[in-house]
Amino acid sequence: MSKKKTSRQTRTATKQNMNQRAPVTTMDAFSNPAARIGFGTMDLLQATEYPMTRMTQNYQLLTSLYRENWIIQNIIATIPNDMIRKWYDLKTSIAPQYLKEMVQLERKTQIRKKLLLGMYWGRLYGGAAGVILIKGQNDLSMPLDMDTVMPGSFLGLHILDRWNGIYPEGELVTDAEDPDFSLPAYYTIRNDETGTMVARVHHSRVIRFIGRELPWMEMVTEQYWGESEIEAIYDELVRRDNVAGNIAALTFRANINYQETDGLDQLLGASNTEIQRRFWNTMAAQSMMESNFGTRLINKGDAIHNTQYTFTGLPDVYDRVMMDVAGAARTPVTKLFGRSPAGLNATGEADLQNYYDYIDGLRETELRGIIERLLPVMALSAWGKMPDDMDIDFSPMQTPDAKDIADI
C-alpha cells in the first residue's frame, strides 16, 4: 500500500473520530439580513417574547376579575352549565319506580349544584376538590369503605377550592390500577387563619376539579392542580376592555363646539389675575346658558364651530376583539356575549354545533369519571345495593329537528 493512500485513510479516520467526539448541532431558520427579516435580525417580530407569568398563582387578581368582570363570570360558568344541563341517563335493571329514590337523593344532597361549584372554582383557580361525606365514616384519612355505606348515609360533597384550605401532600398514588395513579394520595384540609390541620383526607374520598391541563412539570409546580382558564384568556380580555373603554370615551367627543376668540393668547398670558377671572366667569356663564337654553352668547367678531365624530369602522373592530375573546374561551360569541350573529344571513348554527360537539366530548372525558365515582356511593345510599349492570349515558346536546331529518 502506498504512503499516499495510507495518509488519505488516516485523514479520513481522523475526521470520523473528530465527528464522533464533537457532534455539531444545526438549526434551520429563515433569515434575510439585508431586508432585516427573519432569525437574528432587527425584525420587530423577532423581538416578541412570551415570558412565563403563571398568573394562576395570583389569587387576588383572579378573584378581582371574577367579581368585577361579567365576561369572566360567563367564561367560568357557561361551559359547566351546559355540561350539567342535560345531566345523565341511568341504565340499570332497577325497576323504574325505584329510580325516583336516586333522583330524590340527588335533590337532597344538591349534587348538581355542588358539581357546578366544583367546576366553577376549578376553572377559575385551576383547582378545586369535592370531599365525599358519608355518615359514620368520620376518619377521612382512611380509604373509602363501600361495605359501610348504609342507606341514607351519603351526605353529599363539600367543595373547597385550592386556596380555601385544601392542599395536596407530596405522597403519590403508586397503584397503576387506581384512577388517581400518579396523583396525590392524601390531601390536607387546614384552617389558614390559625394554621391548624382540620383533617387529612384519603384520595378515594376526593373528587378533583381542574382548569386546563398542564404538562407534568408544570402540574407539579401548581401543586398537582391545573391552569386557570383566565390565564390563557387574560391578554384578549385586556384588549377587549380597552377597546370598549376607548369607544365609550369617544362618545363624549361625538359633538364638540369650539370658539375662536381674538387675542386669546395675550389674555391667558396676562399677569392681571382679575382679567383672567373675568374671562373664566364669562366662559362659565356662556356654558351654563347653552346647557339650559341651547343658546350661546359670544362677542361680535368671535366665531363658534361644531365638529362631529363618526364611528365608522369601530363596530367592526369591536366585533373582531369579541371573536378573539370567544375563541380563547372556547365559547361561541352568541353564548358568551348574549348577542345575535353579525353578518348577512348569519345564524350561528354552525358555531353552536361545533360548540355542542365540544361539550359532548367534555361530558365523556371529564363528567363521566366524576359521576361514575359517585354513583356506587349514591346507589348504596339510595337502594342499599349496587347493581352490577349500572351504567350511564349522555344524551346529545343538540338533536336534529324535523326539518334537519327531512333534509337528510
Predicted regions and their residues:
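Tryptophan-centered motif/residue detector
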Residues: 79, 185-188, 192-193, 304, ...
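Structured, mid-chain assembly/scaffold modules that mediate subunit interfaces
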Residues: 59-222
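Surface-exposed polar/charged interaction patches
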Residues: 21, 36, 68, 72, ...
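Exposed alpha-helical structural elements
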Residues: 25, 61, 70-71, 83, ...
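N-terminal-proximal low-complexity accessory segments that begin disordered
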Residues: 1-85
